[in-house]
Each structure stands twice: as C-alpha cells, then as structure tokens.
C-alpha cells in the first residue's frame, strides 16, 4: 500500500513538474511573441518613418521642377517676345501710308536715276541727287561725272525710264526695300530709233529727316 502511494505521489509530482515546465514554456513563448510583436511594431514604425523621409525628399526634389519649368517658359516667352519686337513688330508699326510713301520714293528715284538727256544733264543729275543719301550719293556723283556725262554728250544718249510695277519687300520705321520693275528706252546719235529694255531693281531706302531716300540701287 505504501509503495502504491509513493508511486502515485511520484506521478503527481512529475505531472506537476511537466505542467510547470509547459506553463513556463508557454509564458516564454508569449513573452517571445510579445517581444516579436514589439520589434515588428518598432520596425514598422521605423519603416514608416523612413518612407516618410524618403517621400519628403522626393517632394523636395520634385518641387523645384515646376518652378524651373515656369522659369524656362517665362524666359522662352521673353525671348519670343523680344524676337517679335525686334523682327516683326516694326513692320506692323508702319501703316499702309508709309508703304505707299516708300514705293513712291523708290519709283520716283529710279526714274530720276535712269532718265537723262544730253541737253539737260546738269538738271537731270541734280534731280537724281535729291533722291539719294549716304555713300550711294557720293558714288552717283563720281559715276555720272566720269562715265555717264562724257558718253551722253559724245553719243547724244537719251534715256527715259518708266516704272511698270513696284512692291515693298521690307518695311521698317526707318528703312525699306522696294522691288521695282522698269522699262527703259534709249536713243543715240547712231541709233535714233528707241531701243527698249526691261529690268528690275532692288531699291534700298532710308528715312532721312522724314523723307525716304535711296541708299542702295541693286539690279536683280
């Protein structure tokens, strides 16, 4: 009987020890789980913080981009505006009246330059000079005195020019280019019958004291 009681007590003690071990193991597991959860929470918080900082950096990096684009657009717009004012606006600041005045000056000047008679050379040259300015005026004086006048007197050359058409090629407040189409008849002592010639001239003008004057005369 005593041995049986001893065995029962022994088994009870063993069972109690097993239960205590299981309980301790369970508590250890719970503690480990709680520690893991805490670590996970800490890691999750750290990751969120890191993502927040990364996102903030991206925002800081990306925010200047629209500003740069705006600045580039403003610069581009300013450059476009400058080009418009520099190249195109002056044409628009001149009205149709200015264009007609430039065409008239180019036409009258062309007729004066290409028309002369041996009997009225001085008057013809003076009329032509009144339409000229700048270096071209100096060139015309030299050319007529050295070339045109001697030939006109010697051969009795007489030329008469008529403008057929004229149109503005470029127009600015203080300068213009006009394309002029001319018919010219010429007679001489050796050829009394008029010979006709058609030509075109690019006439460059400058506004001097409010008047359009020819500064270049280029056959084309």
Swiss-Prot record:
Ranges where the record places region Disordered: 1-50
UniProt membrane topology term: Single-pass membrane protein
Record key words, sorted: Membrane, Transmembrane, Transmembrane helix
Any one of the GO CC terms: membrane
Keyword NAD set for record: no
Primary subcellular site in the record, as a coarse category: membrane
Subcellular location: Membrane
Keyword Transmembrane helix: yes
Parts of the chain that traverse the membrane: 65-85
Bias kind Polar residues: ranges: 39-48
Family from the record: To M.tuberculosis Rv1363c.
Name recorded for this polypeptide: Uncharacterized protein MT1407
């Amino acid at each position: 009987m005593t041995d049986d009681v001893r065995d029962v007590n022994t088994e009870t003690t063993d069972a109690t020890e097993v239960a205590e071990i299981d309980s301790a193991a369970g508590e250890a597991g719970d503690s480990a789980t709680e520690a893991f959860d805490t670590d996970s929470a800490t890691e999750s918080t750290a990751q969120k913080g890191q993502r927040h900082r990364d996102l903030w950096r991206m925002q800081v990096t990306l925010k200047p981009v629209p500003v740069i684009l705006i600045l580039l657009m403003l610069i581009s717009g300013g450059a476009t505006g400058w080009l418009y004012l520099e190249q195109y606006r002056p044409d628009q600041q001149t009205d149709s009246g200015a264009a007609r005045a430039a065409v008239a000056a180019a036409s009258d000047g062309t007729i004066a330059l290409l028309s002369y008679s041996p009997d009225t050379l001085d008057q013809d040259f003076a009329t032509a000079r009144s339409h000229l300015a700048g270096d071209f005026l100096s060139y015309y004086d030299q050319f007529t005195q050295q070339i045109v006048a001697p030939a006109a007197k010697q051969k009795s050359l007489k030329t008469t020019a008529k403008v057929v058409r004229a149109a503005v090629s470029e127009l600015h407040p203080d300068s213009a280019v006009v394309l002029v189409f001319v018919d010219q008849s010429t007679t001489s002592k050796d050829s009394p019958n008029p010979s006709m010639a058609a030509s075109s001239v690019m006439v460059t003008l400058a506004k001097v004291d409010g008047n359009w004057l020819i500064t270049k005369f280029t056959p084309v």
